[in-house]
């Protein structure tokens, strides 16, 4: 019988918490900003590599997002060393940072649904206005 959560999933979950704390408290690079969220971590089966998915709140500019990812990638060695001190792992995974646009895309979809519902409400309240157009 297989375990519900394997070791890579448990390590990824703990890494997500620790990296979020490190980004909040230790990273002082202005390109990263204060509003960086770690939305997920995927760890390889051998725990040698980790993909870290981050979002930058209040950053709608694509250049700022790219600069933030580059800053995180440049600081990945430092983050990895702090991660090694925080977690007791024999091998600390090599970190690669990716921008996770699912939060932004979800907000966009939510706004679209809200506007469609609002438009339907207006049409239901004023059915004559739709026929005149």
UniProtKB/Swiss-Prot annotation:
GO terms for molecular function: ribosomal small subunit binding. The keyword Cytoplasm applies. It holds the Pfam family RBFA. One of its GO terms (cellular component) is cytosol. InterPro entries: KH_dom-like_a/b, RbfA, RbfA_dom_sf, Ribosome-bd_factorA_CS. Keywords: Cytoplasm, Ribosome biogenesis. The keyword Transferase does not apply. GO terms for biological process: maturation of SSU-rRNA. It is found in: Cytoplasm. Monomer. Binds 30S ribosomal subunits, but not 50S ribosomal subunits or 70S ribosomes. One of several proteins that assist in the late maturation steps of the functional core of the 30S ribosomal subunit. Associates with free 30S ribosomal subunits (but not with 30S subunits that are part of 70S ribosomes or polysomes). Required for efficient processing of 16S rRNA. May interact with the 5'-terminal helix region of 16S rRNA. Belongs to the RbfA family. NCBIfam families: rbfA. This is Ribosome-binding factor A. It comes from Cronobacter sakazakii (strain ATCC BAA-894).
């Amino acid at each position: 019988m297989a375990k519900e959560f394997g070791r890579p999933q448990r390590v990824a979950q703990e890494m997500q918490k620790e990296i979020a704390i490190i980004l909040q408290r230790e990273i002082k690079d202005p390109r990263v900003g204060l509003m960086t969220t770690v939305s997920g971590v995927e760890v390889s089966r051998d725990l040698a590599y980790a993909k870290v998915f981050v979002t930058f709140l209040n950053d709608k500019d694509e250049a700022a997002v790219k600069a933030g990812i580059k800053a995180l990638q440049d600081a990945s060695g430092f983050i990895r060393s702090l991660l090694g001190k925080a977690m007791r792992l024999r091998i600390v995974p090599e970190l690669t940072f990716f921008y996770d646009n699912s939060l932004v895309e979800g907000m966009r979809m939510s706004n679209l649904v809200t506007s469609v519902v609002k438009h339907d409400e207006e049409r239901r309240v004023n059915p004559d206005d739709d026929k005149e157009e």
